[in-house]
Amino acid sequence: MVGGGVAAFDCSGDGLPELFLAGGAAPSALFLNRSVKAGQLAFEKTLTGVEVEGATGAYPLDVDGDGITDLAILRVGENQMMRGLGNCRFERANEAWGFDGGDAWHTAFAATWEKGADWPTLAVGTYIDRTQEDFPWGHCTTNWLIRPAPGERRFAPGAALEPGFCSLSMLFTDWNRSGTPALRVANDREYYKGGQEQLWHIAPGEAPHLFTEVEGWARLRVWGMGIASADLDGDTYPEYFLTSMADSKLQTLKAGPGKPAYADVAFKRGVTAHRPYTGGDIRPSTGWHAQFEDVNNDCRADLFVAKGNVWAMPDFAEKDPNNLLLQKEDGSFEEAGDRAGVASMATGRGGAVVDLNADGALDLVVVNRFAPAQVWRNSGQGLGHWLAVKPQMPGPNRDAIGAWIEVRAGDMTTRRELTRGGGHVSGQLVPWHFGLADQTEAEVRVIWPDGTEGPWQRVAADGVWVLSPGAEPVAWAP
């Protein structure tokens, strides 16, 4: 019903991301990327140690800071932390890392590194109580915050994030650029009682607690299924897109960083995505995975939304095509899913917008319910130049989660927050992609997780660059 995620990450070292697909009742699988660089896409299913039943989704991250990607697998039942061994081999690490995988219907995940920590902090979201299948309403289960054990490189027992309101997406995000991320939680109003969307204070050394209406957080009730974030208006603060049934939301800060008070600008921007735009079904849509990426390399973030009916819900569209919303010069978006060829009528869930063949054009993966997953190669004509950034830093947080990347190309400046979480049970660990339009070079800098601002550095377009603190950019090639 929910779940069906995909994780994209390069575990073979060839610069082409592999795909982990959650299998639900069937075993999950890892597909090695055998694509031709800048050519046809091809994948090979391979036994790697991640084949588990009951998987709902997965997120790649380097938990132990050894430079090898690990994988957090969400499941109906016990979650599994899989330690990367190199060459796309994995082993269970729950016991070695002190990770309590729980025994619930797990449907959301996020990770961050708190200040001074040498081990990540995780948030894990759960859905309805599986013992209440006959009457699930009002039976949402507990979410968890899992922090490092003091003085040890392992996890401490989790702290309950209560109340839980049937979470389907989580994201650690520095919403006000304070240097301390908070935790956003998207919740499904179908099953909770008295619930709402949530924003948690997660301050180092302090117990988590919710932002309140007194602090500016307004009650919002949606069928929250996915979160995507991007700075769309150039004010340095992220906007948040929330998928739902019927109209989706696009939230922007009302009056700066003083309080988390948001205005919904989805209608103004043209991203409500509230009903199908092709196929003849006019009932309300159901949105799942969402992701901002520049798919035509014009320096403007576009938006992909995976669509699909929950489970024979007659009041909602059965033929519900995915959205590919291209951002225009005025900041509004226009639908391009039909002419791009991605308006599938399959029942979509998780997804990934990612460069699968190292040609600088972002491709698309969607996991479907009751149908095979779909992969689309980006064969668009007239795409702009591009740049991909691979931040690397010494210490435990090697991939600089919590940093910001800023890119100046001509008179355009774009920025991205480096997060791990969000979407719908689908995560990626790949170089961060920026379109450059007609620019053949750009200036780039990283604002590192501790707030240190790296210098602006000039790099050539159409390549991947490694940025590290105190070092010159290095062109990366496998």
Where do the protein language model's features map onto the residues?
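A detector of repeated loop/turn-to-beta-strand junctions in beta-rich toroidal repeat architectures
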Residues: 27, 78, 139-142, 194-196, ...
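Short, conserved, GDST-rich strand-edge loop motifs in beta-rich repeat architectures
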Residues: 124-141, 186-194, 305-319
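Loop/turn-rich, solvent-exposed surfaces of beta-rich toroidal or solenoidal domains
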Residues: 238, 242, 249, 287-312, ...
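Hydrophobic beta-strand segments that make up the repeating blades of beta-propeller
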Residues: 16-23, 68-75, 120-127, 170, ...
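Blade-edge motifs of beta-propeller repeat domains
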Residues: 1, 32-54, 83-104, 121-123, ...
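Aromatic- and Gly/Pro-rich amphipathic surface segment
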Residues: 1-7, 17, 21-25
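Beta-propeller blade termini
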Residues: 3-13, 32-33, 55-65, 69, ...
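Gly/Ser/Thr/Pro-enriched helix-cap/hinge segments flanking short amphipathic alpha-helices
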Residues: 117-122, 126, 152-153, 206, ...
